[in-house]
Amino acid sequence: MNDNIYLVRPALKMKEEALAYREEHFVNGEKIICGSELFDQTESYEEWLESVTRNTSCETVNENWVVTDTFFAVRKSDNRIIGMIDLRHTLNDFLKDLGNCGYSVRPSERKKGYAKEMLGQILLVAKAAGMEEIHISVEKENAASLKVIQRNGGVYERSFDHEGTTADIYKIYLK
């Protein structure tokens, strides 16, 4: 695994860089930022940060959500936010087809191996949390993400229909 990035929990001091990260997705025509715990839908960074923080604990998690750890992937050389990734510790009925993990990479930083590195690092977080496996979904036409999942040990489990498109669920066993 490369050692170019580190995962860090969102913080207020990251607001400006986080908003620039989000804006780059929007300018690129992307309305959904996977792995962002609805950062793409929030008006206020502070409210989103409060929600993300609450969702890290079973005592404070939103009643419609599951305990989730959300991270920015930050490049070590310049502290630029490269991506976002989240880890859902359990799956409810809504999430059973979406999986334990979602991630996104900044449009200008794609095809540089960051997604593989991010997923590899979140697998270590999952293992440290006592998880034995994670499920992760990928749309059929997302060949790049499929490679990331497979290179991190993903094993095909099943296919399903999601909002008019076919997606696959992969399982990654944590050793």
Residue ranges of model-derived segments:
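Conserved catalytic-core motifs of GNAT/GCN5-like acyltransferases
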Residues: 137, 155-169
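Conserved GNAT acetyl-CoA-binding A-motif
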Residues: 126-137
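Conserved acetyl-CoA-binding loop-helix of GNAT-fold acetyltransferases
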Residues: 103-105, 111-124, 128, 147-151
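Conserved beta-strand-loop-alpha-helix junction that forms the acyl-donor binding cleft
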Residues: 136-146
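A short, internal acetyl-CoA/4′-phosphopantetheine-binding micro-motif in the GNAT/acyltransferase core
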Residues: 74, 91, 100-111, 139
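GNAT-family acyltransferases
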Residues: 1-100, 165-175
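Conserved G/P- and acidic residue-centered "switch" motifs that form tight phosphate/ATP-binding loops
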Residues: 79, 113, 130, 142
